[in-house]
């Protein structure tokens, strides 16, 4: 999980991780189109983690190409807040991980 801190503040991760179910309901009204339950944080970790593993395999030439279909999505999440059904931006987390840990210098992100 340290790779999340390349992209997000401790406060943001803490907000998503440590809220109880009653607070999740309150947060749903604070953020745009975010629905939460007791498994939301763990699901978001798996989503970002799967993309990290995929990108690591590409960078290390273990695979030649890839296509990731990941749920829950992440492309609407802001750098400091959940938004649009997304808690964390999976692509930002994975790319920042590769830049910090695998010495990747450049990336191209296409989101349509």
Can you say where each PLM-predicted feature lies in the sequence?
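HDAC/HDAC-like amidohydrolase catalytic core signature
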Residues: 1-112
